[in-house]
Amino acid sequence: MVSAGDFRKGVTFEKDGQPCLVVDFQHVKPGKGAAFVRTKYKNLKTGAIREESFNPSEKFPKAVIDTRQMQYLYNDGELYYFMDQENFEQIPLNYEQVEDAIKFLKENEVATIRFYQGQPFQVEAPNFAELEVTDTEPGIKGDTASNVTKAATVETGAVVQVPLFINTGDKVKIDTRTGEYLSRV
């Protein structure tokens, strides 16, 4: 059990049978009345973020989240298949489970998959991805205004904003957490 008074960023707990992650918290001690903990937490299954205040003595079951490194194998049109690096077990995941990560994952790359009570619920791509630009408008010579970007489609199908000097065929480094261009590779 974990009490609301022990909440810190990154603490996991169960609320209404759902795994939750503390995103932000603030211990509030008003001049009058009882202290409370203002908490912003994310439901790890649905991705919904909520804000709620709790009594510091309120207790919640600790959510045990298992994390495994798994290799992305392929997509059969409906499901995305991942293989456990240790026991070579393959698991199929649907689009809702891989939605955010699959934009930056190439086949055979390793991703982090989180499990709750033995069921996979979240896929996380590596923090940085090096991807080839497959489609973008050509840069126009003389267009040198600072911080001007254009849309570029990378090999996984994701669309990212890149500087004007990036052309089709260039490899770019992308921060997968924000989807932002970092550099040319």
Swiss-Prot record:
It is found in: Cytoplasm. Coiled coil: none annotated. CDD domains: S1_EF-P_repeat_1, S1_EF-P_repeat_2. Pfam families: EFP, EFP_N, Elong-fact-P_C. The keyword Cytoplasm applies. Keywords: Cytoplasm, Elongation factor, Protein biosynthesis. InterPro entries: Elong-fact-P_C, NA-bd_OB-fold, Rib_uL2_dom2, Transl_elong_fac_P/YeiP, Transl_elong_KOW-like, Transl_elong_P/YeiP_cen, Transl_elong_P/YeiP_CS, Transl_elongation_fac_P. Its main location: cytoplasm. One of its GO terms (cellular component) is cytoplasm. One of its GO terms (molecular function) is translation elongation factor activity. Pathway: Protein biosynthesis; polypeptide chain elongation. One of its GO terms (biological process) is peptide biosynthetic process. NCBIfam families: efp (TIGR00038), PRK00529.1 (NF001810). Involved in peptide bond synthesis. Stimulates efficient translation and peptide-bond synthesis on native or reconstituted 70S ribosomes in vitro. Probably functions indirectly by altering the affinity of the ribosome for aminoacyl-tRNA, thus increasing their reactivity as acceptors for peptidyl transferase. Belongs to the elongation factor P family. This is Elongation factor P. It comes from Clostridioides difficile (strain 630).
